[in-house]
């Protein structure tokens, strides 16, 4: 190794250095030199004797003095280049340059050329070779001390560069691992985006189902309205009220069916499943279906307990946090719109209401709802149009028979209502035996064309005697 450095031409002297003079200047030009006292050859220079090429008058220094300075510099350089430790100094300097400008790749062969461990090996090899050939030190102790200190400084510099590389590698590794593993807040954001998209698609599908259901119900209500108008000129407000009630109830049923059956409709298309999975990008469809099924089974209380969350997390393969966030979004985006829709329709989200009462041909339960605080207009369902009898609602002294078909009673202003059940419809049938307390008299029912007066209260008075008003019978034959 020492022979390798001895053969280098740029270490033989300053004349052999291949450095352009335009970059660093002429190496033989006079330069300002600090006082050098550690060298035992050459006279000491005073601080006032600074000469350089940049001096305004380069010819001030005598020629004999300049030649003496150049000779002293040349002798010092030759002494340094010829020192036994100079090849080791050049080696550590090259390693520092490589550690500074070369990218480190630990997995690549030759990546540890500029490490401090390799330099320790180089020192051992160099010491063996030099001791076999010549001594490590020269006859000048000051020069030996200078070389040793220079090697130590470069060695410290190499160690510091190695520490910097280790810190850089550690930072890069941690940063890349942080990018690869998503943070929990990112999962929450993606889950919200995916659930909002899926809920939007489900609501759009349910609106399509409602559009398919509504035309038939509209036709039925139109037929019922025409039947009313053919017999008697019933008020339009009552017809629209019943029509809106039927439409809203069907809308509620359609919404329940469309949302509660995730396996129908567009979900059967595998291409659309893939597109939707890409849009959501986080939860598999099987996991979503499991949680949605649990939600619709517990609509009355859609709040899973901690044990149920753990069970759902095991069934779906998700974390408890993901399950919890999904149910938070589902209660806001699925359950709440259903409650709002049923409230707008005047239909309470109670299974006993929809299952306990039978439905009439008009779509309303036979246990008909009575509106508190609203004038009852005495409109009979379509199935009871041919039934004899004269029903006067909320009887008062102004009850009268509508014999003229051209008369249209004034439209009553509806009040905020609350639904409650009235008596069964069979209690209004003439052939059904009535209790005297219900009829308020023991005599037979009045003639169909007869006007009900104050001393003969009507059957509907038993429904709510507190509600009174001037109401007229519009179903007189």
From Swiss-Prot:
Which residue ranges does the record annotate as region Transcriptional activation domain? 340-477
Transmembrane spans: none
**Gene3D superfamilies, from UniProt?**
Homeodomain-like
Positions of the UniProt region annotated as Interaction with DNA: 299-333
- GO molecular-function annotation terms? DNA binding; DNA-binding transcription activator activity, RNA polymerase II-specific; DNA-binding transcription factor activity, RNA polymerase II-specific; RNA polymerase II cis-regulatory region sequence-specific DNA binding; sequence-specific DNA binding; sequence-specific double-stranded DNA binding; transcription factor binding
Q: Does the keyword Membrane apply?
A: no
So what family is this one in?
Belongs to the TALE/MEIS homeobox family.
- The protein's name: Homeobox protein Meis2
- Organism from which the protein derives: Homo sapiens (Human)
